[in-house]
């Protein structure tokens, strides 16, 4: 059956803008707020009640509705949960709403089916400079429709995998916050820090560009984790490093963001990678000491970047009494657990999709 035949409505969001009103409790999502299969309210705009009500007449977001990004980055999806914010949320035209007819189709079954066909949905999009998915093409997308009891059974299994993935994500956030708290206690709030010296990063670490000849075009479906200037976002059939290191986004909007890399990994064009070569500090200490793009010397305005020379010359506090090494010993199990959770999520996502 066509998607339009099993849905009450398939449309997009507001064609135009809304007036901001901080604290109103009425939300205006854009495509950037649809990711990791959730509606992300962390940086969402709040708008006036009047603008919300006007747009809500068109979108009428309810629990069980599916949101799909249809412009720019095509195909990111989320299912609206039974949350008090859901009924106070509308969205821009870069987001489409798929409102299932629950007499015919289970919302979660439809969501997971569309998720499994993500590459086909993306291929429907046209445009050269800015990809756009036409609502007409989306409405004609073919959906197999087993009996409702079978739909519910499939959705229940897949939903349990998603729940485990989300649990691992929350655990990783908690572990990261714990590592940051330990770092703050040992190095930021330490009254002895005034007597510590500094060294250039290049004096205590191996600092070099990532593979400038490799881009995302080389990514494969499965393999060894690869870091771009946006973070760990793909796989390569080989690995360049088998060491704990730090990957720095060196060119573009994310310049100054860092990620800890463990196990076997690579980093591609527009990145700088480094790891400790000193007995005084651990790589885990370096990732925390360099965390935050405000700490890095950014050049350029339209296109921010960090030069390799500037990265090597960046000054790093070097604590006394081997504290930076002790910190590595303390937090290494936390980072290892985070890496394990991430790998487990990869396997769970493959089972689900």
Task: Explain the meaning of each model-derived region.
Residues 30-31, 50-115, 228-312:
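A short beta-sheet element
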Residues 1, 87-94, 127-155, 265-271, ...:
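A short glycine-rich beta-alpha junction/loop motif
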